[in-house]
Structures are given as C-alpha cells and as structure tokens.
Amino acid sequence: MKGVRPELQTCPCCGARGACRIHACYGRSLVDFISGAPVCHSLCIMRLICTCGHTHAILPDFIIPYSGYGLFFILRVLAEYFLRLSTVERLCERFSITLSQLRCWLDLFQTQKEEWLGALSSMEASSLSFLKALLMQAAYSDFASAFVRRFTKSFLQSHKNPAPYCQQVFGP
C-alpha cells in the first residue's frame, strides 16, 4: 500500500505514535469476480511492527480478515441474490460457491446489518436497500472504519480476531 507511512501510524495496541516500521510482507490469495468469472489474485500484504512488539497487517478495505473472498465479490453475490436475478443453484454455480457458503454470507450480512442499524431500523430497511446504501457512499472507508471501531471486527468478517488482539483503524 503505497500511501502507508509507518512513521506516522499510531499502534492500535499500545497507542505509541511513530513507533511502527515495515517488518515484512506475506502472500495472500483473494477471490474476485472479473469479466463474468471468479478470479484468484495473489497479493502482497505489508506488515508493520511496533516497538511494543505487536505486528500489524495493513489490509485495504476490500480485504476481509480471515476470508479468501474479496469484499466486493461477496457484496456482488449478495446483490444478485437480493435482486433474484437467477435461482440460488445458478447463482452458486456462476460464482463457484457452495450453498452453505451463500447461507453463511446471508446470515452474516443480516446479523451485521442488524448490529449496525439496530433491530428496529434493520427490520424497516430491506437487505437490498442497505447494500445499495453501502455501495453508494462517497467513501466506503468511512463506513468500514466506523464498523471496526464499533465492533472490533471488519464488516463481513465472520468472527472477532483471536485474543489478545486489538484491531482498530490505523491512522495518523
């Protein structure tokens, strides 16, 4: 990530500002959907280390921690499901996913929609309208950052990070 300047970051664990430096990179695979087909990309993820000893992976918003699928891949699957563009079987075939994977994403989306909006507002807002609102924001990063700060996990992340972990948003 070209824009990341480790010397300006604040460690989300100890709070030290300017104590991080580039530590390493690791490879990661990510499934996306391009030109009508699922595509697997290989990415290089930067890791920082703080003087307190904690290391941190710098993930762009389109990567969901602990998921091999990209955020926009999952949102596209869900959008096509909510729009009822095809049968569930065809949808799963088109995106090369299992029915159980689709159900997991649907359950997770509904749960996190309710967490974000609150139970009553969630019942009033359709899943499709919530999804559209996410995608129509001027900066998805604002929502993603607010979600992490509020719930200590990324949107559509299936579980909280292993303890002891202090996922927060890096920033100057």
Report the location of each language-model feature:
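Arginine residue identity/basic-tract feature
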Residues: 5, 9, 17, 21, ...
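Short, positively charged, Gly/Tyr-enriched micro-motifs
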Residues: 53-138, 143
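Long C-terminal interaction/binding lobes of large macromolecular proteins
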Residues: 3, 7-9, 102, 115-172
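Short, conserved DNA-binding cores of transcription-related domains
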Residues: 1-64
